From Swiss-Prot:
UniProt source species: Homo sapiens (Human)
Modified residues (Phosphoserine): S317
Presequence range in chain numbering: 1-30
Known function: Catalyzes the 2-hydroxylation of not only racemic phytanoyl-CoA and the isomers of 3-methylhexadecanoyl-CoA, but also a variety of other mono-branched 3-methylacyl-CoA esters (with a chain length of at least seven carbon atoms) and straight-chain acyl-CoA esters (with a chain length longer than four carbon atoms). Does not hydroxylate long and very long straight chain acyl-CoAs or 2-methyl- and 4-methyl-branched acyl-CoAs.
Record: residues binding Fe cation: H175, D177, H264
InterPro entries: PhyH, Phytyl_CoA_dOase-like
Ranges in coiled-coil conformation: none
Name listed for the protein in its UniProt record: Phytanoyl-CoA dioxygenase, peroxisomal
Catalyzed reactions per annotation: phytanoyl-CoA + 2-oxoglutarate + O2 = 2-hydroxyphytanoyl-CoA + succinate + CO2; 3-methylhexadecanoyl-CoA + 2-oxoglutarate + O2 = 2-hydroxy-3-methylhexadecanoyl-CoA + succinate + CO2; hexadecanoyl-CoA + 2-oxoglutarate + O2 = 2-hydroxyhexadecanoyl-CoA + succinate + CO2; octanoyl-CoA + 2-oxoglutarate + O2 = 2-hydroxyoctanoyl-CoA + succinate + CO2
Oxidoreductase listed as a keyword: yes
Keywords: Cataract, Deafness, Dioxygenase, Disease variant, Ichthyosis, Iron, Metal-binding, Oxidoreductase, Peroxisome, Peroxisome biogenesis disorder, Phosphoprotein, Retinitis pigmentosa, Transit peptide, Vitamin C
Cofactor(s) listed in the protein's UniProt record: Fe cation; L-ascorbate; ATP; Mg(2+)
C-alpha cells in the first residue's frame, strides 16, 4: 500500500508538468591485477547458489566485485536500443519521467534535438523499448545470481559519452554507486552494464578497483576539476591513489556485473565518436529503504530532492524514498518490499 501511495504522489506531480559456454564467460582486464588467491570456498557472501555461475566465476566475483560476461546481449537488441535513443534525441518520443542530461561544457544556446547534445538518458522505466533491456532473459539469468529470484529494476541509464572537449569533462570520477541508493543490503544489489559498441581506454572504458566492494561506503562530493563537473558526478573524496586499477576493454554485447560498493569510474573519450552503453541497477525486492539523514549520503539526497522540487514544485511533498519507489519496477518474481 505504501508503494502505491508513493507512486500515486509522483504520478500526480508528473501530471502537473540462453547460457554461454564456459569459455565465453570470463573477465578481460587490460591493466592492473586481479586475484582469487585469498578466497575461501566455504564463504560465499556476494553470490547465491544456483546453476548459472561456475565455481571459478563465483570466486572471481567474490574476490574482485565484478564479472564480465562476453557477448551476452544480441546485436539485434542493441540496435533497437540505439534506434530508440536516437528517437529520444530527436524528440520523436518523450517517455514519462525520463531525465535527459547534457555535458557541462554545452551551453544552452547550443541545445538542439541531436544525439551530439545528449550525454545520457536515465529513468527510462516508462520507455517500453529501452526498458526491454531490464527484462532480457540473458540479463536476468545472471542478475538472479546476486539478488535472488525477486528482482526489482531500480535505476536505468543509457550513456552516450561524448568526445572530450579538451576540458576533460567526459571523465566520470571514481565513485561507488551505493552513494546514490537509499536501500540495503548492498550485497543484494548489482549493476548490469552492457557495451553497445567496442569500448577501450581510447573512448573511455570503465575502470575498476578490484576488491574494493569489501570495504565501506566512502564520503562523496563533486571533485574540484578545473574544466567543470557534470551534474550528479560525485566522486570519492578519499581513496588509495596507488591501488591497482583494471580497465575493462569490452566488445558490443559484453556485459559487466558489479557490486554497488565497487569503486569505479571512466576516463576521457579521446575519439570523435560517441561511446554508448546501457545499464540497469537491480536489487532484491526483499531489500529495504533506509533514512540517509545524518550519513555521508545526505548531500546526494538534498540534491536529488532539490531537483525534484525544481521540476515539480516545492509544494509537492516528495522525499528520496518516494522518488526511488516511483522509479522501481518489478521484473521477476514478487514485489515483497521495495
Amino acid at each position: 500500500m505504501e508503494q502505491l501511495r508513493a507512486a500515486a504522489r509522483l504520478q500526480i506531480v508528473l501530471g502537473h508538468l540462453g547460457r554461454p559456454s564456459a569459455g565465453a564467460v570470463v573477465a578481460h582486464p587490460t591493466s592492473g591485477t586481479i586475484s582469487s588467491a585469498s578466497f575461501h570456498p566455504q564463504q560465499f557472501q556476494y553470490t547465491l547458489d544456483n546453476n548459472v555461475l561456475t565455481l571459478e566465476q563465483r570466486k572471481f566475483y567474490e574476490e574482485n566485485g565484478f564479472l564480465v560476461i562476453k557477448n551476452l546481449v544480441p546485436d539485434a537488441d542493441i540496435q533497437r536500443f540505439r534506434n530508440e535513443f536516437e528517437k529520444i534525441c530527436r524528440k520523436e518520443v518523450k517517455p514519462l519521467g525520463l531525465t535527459v542530461m547534457r555535458d557541462v561544457t554545452i551551453s544552452k544556446s547550443e541545445y538542439a534535438p541531436s544525439e551530439k547534445m545528449i550525454t545520457k538518458v536515465q529513468d527510462f522505466q516508462e520507455d517500453k523499448e529501452l526498458f526491454r533491456y531490464c527484462t532480457l532473459p540473458e540479463i536476468l539469468k545472471y542478475v538472479e545470481c546476486f539478488t535472488g529470484p525477486n528482482i526489482m529494476a531500480m535505476h536505468t541509464m543509457l550513456i552516450n559519452k561524448p568526445p572530450d572537449s579538451g576540458k576533460k569533462t567526459s571523465r566520470h570520477p571514481l565513485h561507488q554507486d551505493l552513494h546514490y541508493f537509499p536501500f540495503r543490503p548492498s550485497d543484494l544489489i548489482v549493476c548490469a552494464w552492457t557495451a553497445m559498441e567496442h569500448i577501450s581506454r581510447n573512448n573511455g572504458c570503465l575502470v575498476v578497483l578490484p576488491g574494493t566492494h569489501k570495504g565501506s561506503l566512502k564520503p562523496h562530493d563533486y571533485p574540484k576539476w578545473e574544466g567543470g563537473v557534470n551534474k550528479m558526478f560525485h566522486g570519492i573524496q578519499d581513496y588509495e591513489e596507488n591501488k591497482a586499477r583494471v580497465h575493462l576493454v569490452m566488445e558490443k554485447g559484453d556485459t559487466v556485473f558489479f557490486h554497488p560498493l565497487l569503486i569505479h569510474g571512466s576516463g576521457q573519450n579521446k575519439t570523435q565518436g560517441f561511446r554508448k552503453a546501457i545499464s540497469c541497477h537491480f536489487a532484491s525486492a526483499d531489500c529495504h529503504y533506509i533514512d540517509v539523514k545524518g550519513t555521508s549520503q545526505e548531500n546526494i539526497e538534498k540534491e536529488v530532492v532539490g531537483i525534484a522540487h525544481k521540476f515539480f514544485g516545492a509544494e509537492n511533498s516528495v522525499n528520496l524514498k518516494d522518488i526511488w519507489m516511483f522509479r522501481a519496477r518489478l521484473v521477476k518474481g514478487e514485489r515483497t518490499n521495495l
